[in-house]
Amino acid sequence: MDANTFIPEHFIDDVKTYLPAHLDIDDFINACRRPLRKSIRVNTLKISVTEFKQYAKQKNWLLTPIPWCEEGFWLERPAAEEQNLALGNTDLHLSGAMYVQEASSMLPPIALKQSIEHTNYVLDMASAPGSKTSQLAALMNNQGVLVANELSSSRLKVLSATLKRMGVGNCALSHFDGVIFGNYMFECFDSILLDAPCSGEGTVRKDADALKNWSIDSNIEIAQVQKDLIKSAFYALKPGGTLVYSTCTLTPLENQHVCDFLLSEFGDCIIPESLSDLFPGASKATTPEGYLHVWPQTFDSEGFFIAKFKKQASSDNPNLKVKKGAFPFQQFESKKSAVFMQTLKQQFGLNTLPGILMQRDKELWLFPQEFEAVQNKIKYARLGIQLGAIHNNGVRLAHEFATAFGKQCKSNVLPLTDTQANDYFQGKDIRLADVSQNTGEVILTLCGCPIGLGKWQKNKVKNSLPRDLVQNTQLITWAQSN
């Protein structure tokens, strides 16, 4: 138990007013004081669950399946490793093979899974730091268009870095207050996830001070923001589309009441869809409305709320707006495209790229195939994947090319040892045991996952890792420092 976890009495008094009858307040308080179990999600854009399990077994990691996410596991590591090597510094994390993600936060994308597997346009309205965005991209198998929005500039940078590491290629990043989507992107999306900003009452097991500034007045203020966002989400959703609303808080003010607002605002145009059968055992957390209200003691996780809706019919939006300004990209010339693709085939055995080659100044980008329909709706902070920089003698490939498409490359691919990978992430060149006759660029892999680019130079590979990604700490294995 963590005696330092701050749980104010007036918060407990409030919880007592809406705690379900079958749950006990003492169990709730005790659960809030227990350390949160570590959990991870396998990134199937880079590695299969079966392959990941094999690597985990070699490390003596104990994986316990999370019942609602087949890619998710609670994780226990050997004590020595746990004490000496941060989970974020392990090879499976650095390679993008996994994401450290709280178990209950995997639920909102799973609630959208059936919808997004058959749709082209998905919006993640409040995306950072990227756990759910990368999960959505994996469920979409990098197909279609995923618009990921984040209001905070600093969090947007974190989101961008996460998506690069995870090999996400179908994403467009935007930097707005989510309330603009209903006006500028009216009925553009087949599926929308609104994981709304909230009071975070369910996160106290991760953050002992999460409730330090808690008040009902604050709940009420946040709920108004959530209502504005969910109204915008409704307008941005196509008729027949699916909306999932979620928070990591417990109070009905930010959960059921926000859903009630949506239903009263749009009447028969939108209906709730029950999540009681989302996974075996979901009924333990199902509300009378069919929402999921996950309490910390229900599944020994963070607290979470998830609701799912189907848009039945359109409703007029009187505030439609149109973006001004020209689109800064143009399609890459067909002759140059052919030369570029031939180069990729010769160097890496890569025959195709899944998208449209676009140019902005001297930058070469790859956009999702279906992006044209929404490209002029808003100004995007970042689109697709930057493949490289255009020079007179061709294209100098970018780091992102490797992390996104290295898995499909068949030649000039170099698996790194732990020592070599440690050197790579620390910005050092990679020493080779023998002189290589290969020339040009090479895809570097770790745990079977592409992690970046290098350049063959006889008895070494020159490091091409961007400077902002270089890490000056012990990585991969703690035993080296003993």
Swiss-Prot record:
InterPro entries: Methyltr_RsmF_N (IPR031341), MeTrfase_RsmB-F_NOP2_cat (IPR049560), MeTrfase_RsmB-F_NOP2_dom (IPR001678), Nol1_Nop2_Fmu_2 (IPR027391), Nop2p (IPR011023), RCMT (IPR023267), rRNA_ssu_MeTfrase_F (IPR023545), SAM-dependent_MTases_sf (IPR029063). Its main location: cytoplasm. The active site is at 248 (nucleophile). Signal peptide: none annotated. S-adenosyl-L-methionine binds at residues 126-132, 150, 177, 195. One of its GO terms (biological process) is rRNA base methylation. It catalyses: cytidine(1407) in 16S rRNA + S-adenosyl-L-methionine = 5-methylcytidine(1407) in 16S rRNA + S-adenosyl-L-homocysteine + H(+). GO terms for cellular component: cytoplasm. It is found in: Cytoplasm. Specifically methylates the cytosine at position 1407 (m5C1407) of 16S rRNA. Belongs to the class I-like SAM-binding methyltransferase superfamily. RsmB/NOP family. This is Ribosomal RNA small subunit methyltransferase F.
